[in-house]
Design a protein with these regions (language model features):
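Hydrophobic, well-ordered secondary-structure elements that form the walls
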Residues: 11, 63, 84, 314, ...
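Active-site-proximal, structured, solvent-exposed surfaces of multi-pass membrane proteins
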Residues: 147-353
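Composition- and surface-driven signal marking solvent-exposed, interaction-prone regions
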Residues: 68-80, 97-98, 229-232, 329, ...
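Structural motif
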Residues: 2, 65-68, 219-220
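Catalytic cores of secreted or luminal carbohydrate-active enzymes
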Residues: 56, 79-171, 277-292
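Short hydrophobic-aromatic micro-motifs
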Residues: 14-16, 63, 83-84, 93, ...
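Extracytoplasmic/lumenal acceptor-recognition loop(s) of multi-pass membrane glycoenzymes
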Residues: 2-56, 90-115, 121-122, 236-237, ...
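Periplasmic/luminal catalytic loop of GT-C fold multi-pass membrane glycosyltransferases
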Residues: 37-81, 85-87
Length: 353
């Protein structure tokens, strides 16, 4: 939480903020449109995200970390702290004619509502989309408890129990019941379980060097609404705050995008304390598309000497007529000048300038 507003250098830009004054378009994009993980109980805390799609889209090229960052390469280290780089990160500003209309975007289901931003710019309704919106496909998968956590419990359902059962099979202590569409949890303490990732369809071939991303979403029904609920996937936390919390976060759908290491086919799921049910599970596996000049056709070269205060200046050589895209949250008070002439600004990617 301490890092939400912290920068390491005056020239650094960040995607997180903790403030009562915020850009509503950006917050809606994070929480509703795109669907980022929400690790904090306070709705005002727009966290640093570990979602690799969001990081690429927002141009997060560098991460400072005390441990390895999947998808990023170490470029410098000072004692335990390293600087990690991802050359696939999007430019902060670029021009393109590879677009998708908002109408088409709004039809996309999870996880394509996230990954579309790596292949198209989403623009106004009056523009025709490019290439019938052809996108990288992701394979449906299922998650099953590893064998060492399974115990038969009738009708094929499985339960992992910590504690005792009485003669009426009433479960006490901590237990996790695997249901057809999710899990039912009664945890008096935090419990970590390993799950295997299984292909639902015929297994697809992964090209060497391509890192896999597990996209996971499920609904949370909290049986004790006056208590927080948290679930970690490979250390990535989502939290639903107690309903009576003054800054209740309304995070009733937990969404994750989990980078996997090469050859990794299991995940660690940590169930937080509480009594709750996780249902409507959606899980997909696949690799992100390579950084493409088809989307990032012309990149802005920022003039650091002329860029200061609330003004950014730079040059761009536009190859095709199209749209100017940034990762700056949209606001009606921005002004844009091209070759010295003021140009009308529009909202792109549903929330950006």
């Amino acid at each position: 939480a301490a890092d939400l507003n912290r920068i390491w250098d005056a020239g650094q830009n960040i995607t997180s903020i903790y403030s009562s004054a915020y850009n509503s378009e950006y917050q809606t994009f994070r929480q509703k449109t795109f669907g980022l993980e929400e690790p904090f109980r306070n709705v005002m805390m727009q966290s640093v995200s570990k979602n690799p799609v969001f990081c690429r889209m927002m141009g997060v090229r560098y991460i400072v970390s005390d441990s390895d960052v999947t998808g990023y390469a170490l470029v410098k280290k000072c004692e335990k702290t390293g600087i990690y780089q991802n050359n696939d990160a999007a430019p902060v500003m670029y021009a393109t004619d590879r677009v998708m209309t908002e109408k088409e975007y709004n039809k996309l289901a999870f996880p394509y509502n996230q990954t579309a931003f790596l292949e198209y710019a989403v623009v106004g309704e009056h523009t025709e989309s490019s290439d019938q919106n052809i996108m990288t496909a992701y394979t449906p998968v299922s998650l099953k408890m590893a064998d060492n956590h399974k115990a038969q419990n009738g009708a094929g359902n499985r339960t992992t129990d910590i504690g005792k059962k009485n003669g009426n099979e009433r479960k006490v202590g901590t237990w996790i019941h695997e249901k057809e569409d999710g899990w039912k949890i009664h945890a008096k303490k935090i419990k970590k379980i390993t799950f295997s990732i299984r292909q639902v369809q015929q297994e697809t071939t992964q090209q060497e060097g391509q890192r896999q991303i597990l996209f996971l979403s499920f609904c949370v029904d909290n049986a004790r609404p006056n208590k927080d609920v948290a679930v970690w996937i490979n250390g990535i936390r989502n939290k639903l705050s107690a309903k009576d919390h003054v800054y209740y976060n309304e995070n009733k759908t937990f969404i994750y995008a989990v980078p996997l290491k090469d050859g990794e086919d299991t995940i660690s799921v940590t169930f937080g304390k509480g009594k709750y049910q996780l249902s409507h599970v959606q899980a997909y596996l696949g690799s992100l598309p390579e950084r493409s000049k088809t989307l990032y056709q012309s990149e802005v070269q920022v003039d650091k000497k002329l860029t200061k205060d609330n003004e950014i200046q730079g040059t761009i050589q536009v190859k095709n007529d199209g749209w100017f895209i940034t990762s700056i949250p949209y606001d009606t008070h921005f002004k844009m000048y091209i070759d010295g002439k003021e140009t009308k600004i529009q909202k792109v990617n549903t929330a950006f300038l």
